[in-house]
Amino acid sequence: MEKLVLIKVGGKIVEEEETLRQLLNDFAAIEGYKVLVHGGGRSATKLAAQLGIESKMVNGRRITDAETLKVVTMVYGGLVNKNIVAGLQALGVNALGLTGADMNLMRSDKRPVAEVDYGFVGDVKEVNADLLASLIHQGIVPVLAPLTHDKQGHMLNTNADTIAGEAAKALAKHFEVTLMFCFEKKGVLLDENDDESVIPEIDRIAFKGYVEQGIIQGGMIPKLENAYQAIDAGVKQVIITQASEIHQGKGTRVF
């Protein structure tokens, strides 16, 4: 089976000119089939403030009301996505920017109201893996924004880690997939204050122990839970690493 690397990047990596330039150079240097998934929450918060729209967060997750949905659609599907595509094209990478609405690539259901009403947020229900694989086999490099649709005419804000995980699981039917989650740290850390304390490998037993000890906490827990869901669905391996090391295989390998 042919190999494919799917990389998810977020935070300041895609929103600061110098870090984005370095990321795109490193991504362009990866040989073979590849997909890039990006976030953009900081840019969305900044634009919302400029427009006088309050950004509401609960447990680190954005509440997406009707006005906020307009902002994230503009920022994720427009500003951030097209800056990445333009940068990759300049490096000779035939990138194509997509949201889940394009060609019905990714359909979601609006998240039901529970303890918190997250608004226009989507939980992915269907990925058009055949279409995505067809684009990839044509030499196109998909750049996926964290937006889906409900096929009823509505866009939905969708977590970028979820987009990456669902795309990787769907593509595992067509490729041997390596899924990489990239952020500012070098990997999963034993000590959050020591950037060199990278845990090289984590299996399920170790993960459970680290959570119980409070070593792994916060946003890293759902990231690792997504990783194990991807592995269960056929993804070959998951790596959590720093964006500057995506072509070196460093970081934390999850298995």
Curated annotation (Swiss-Prot):
EC number: 2.7.2.8
Swiss-Prot/TrEMBL keywords: Amino-acid biosynthesis, Arginine biosynthesis, ATP-binding, Cytoplasm, Kinase, Nucleotide-binding, Transferase
Domain of life: Bacteria
BP terms from Gene Ontology: arginine biosynthetic process via ornithine; L-arginine biosynthetic process
Cell location: Cytoplasm
Broad enzyme group: transferase
Catalyses which reaction(s): N-acetyl-L-glutamate + ATP = N-acetyl-L-glutamyl 5-phosphate + ADP
Pfam families, per database record: AA_kinase
Membrane-spanning intervals of the chain: none
GO function term, MF aspect, one: ATP binding
Pathway per the UniProt entry: Amino-acid biosynthesis; L-arginine biosynthesis; N(2)-acetyl-L-ornithine from L-glutamate: step 2/4
InterPro entries: AceGlu_kinase-like_sf (IPR036393), AcgluKinase_fam (IPR004662), ArgB (IPR037528), Asp/Glu/Uridylate_kinase (IPR001048)
One GO cellular component term: cytoplasm
Binding sites annotated in the UniProt record for substrate: G40, G41, R62, N157
PANTHER family referenced in this protein's UniProt entry, alphabetically: N-ACETYLGLUTAMATE SYNTHASE (PTHR23342), N-ACETYLGLUTAMATE SYNTHASE, MITOCHONDRIAL (PTHR23342:SF0)
Name used for this protein in its record: Acetylglutamate kinase
Gene: argB
